[in-house]
Amino acid sequence: MSIILGIDPGSRITGYGVVQQKGSKCIYIASGCIRTKGDTLAPKLDMIFNGISEIIKQYQPTEFGIEQVFMAKNPDSALKLGQARGAAIVAATQADLYVCEYSARQIKQAVSGSGGATKEQVQQMVMQILNLSGRPQADAADGLAVAICHAHTAQTIVAMSGKVSKTVRGRFR
């Protein structure tokens, strides 16, 4: 049984989702957004770091997943996103959590079956997978999607580990 914290980083809004993995099922625990204020970046990064640290203390995750930076049209936006990710990653590593990173395409594929899924499709699938009665806010849904992606990816790696060790020159024994 694992508790997974998924993070969708952003310099203005960082979405998070906490799920418990029981076998092949994901059970909703919590989700929300860390909303930063102000015009300067340093206080925003501090809010992200402190917010993630507080979530870690409250929910005691055993695993941590975060979305990778994608190259936006605006390089300044990509740099700010990278710094927001850094603040979240430091909070995780200070809590002795191993950090796993996933591309937006991997996350969409794991949740919806399509790497090109829209935000609305991801939200809908998150609702179905976690059996939620209402639609989570977009950034929170993305955080939950990261956690679900991590759960599915980790499960696949564990399932394959026994088989991979039984191969010789690419063939199963």
Swiss-Prot record:
The keyword DNA damage applies. It is found in: Cytoplasm. Its cofactor is Mg(2+). Signal peptide: none annotated. Keywords: Cytoplasm, DNA damage, DNA recombination, DNA repair, DNA-binding, Endonuclease, Hydrolase, Magnesium, Metal-binding, Nuclease. PROSITE patterns: RUVC. Mg(2+) 2 binds at residue 67. InterPro entries: RNaseH-like_sf (IPR012337), RNaseH_sf (IPR036397), X-over_junc_endoDNase_Mg_BS (IPR020563), X-over_junc_endoDNase_RuvC (IPR002176). The RuvA-RuvB-RuvC complex processes Holliday junction (HJ) DNA during genetic recombination and DNA repair. Endonuclease that resolves HJ intermediates. Cleaves cruciform DNA by making single-stranded nicks across the HJ at symmetrical positions within the homologous arms, yielding a 5'-phosphate and a 3'-hydroxyl group; requires a central core of homology in the junction. The consensus cleavage sequence is 5'-(A/T)TT(C/G)-3'. Cleavage occurs on the 3'-side of the TT dinucleotide at the point of strand exchange. This is Crossover junction endodeoxyribonuclease RuvC. It comes from Psychromonas ingrahamii (strain DSM 17664 / CCUG 51855 / 37).
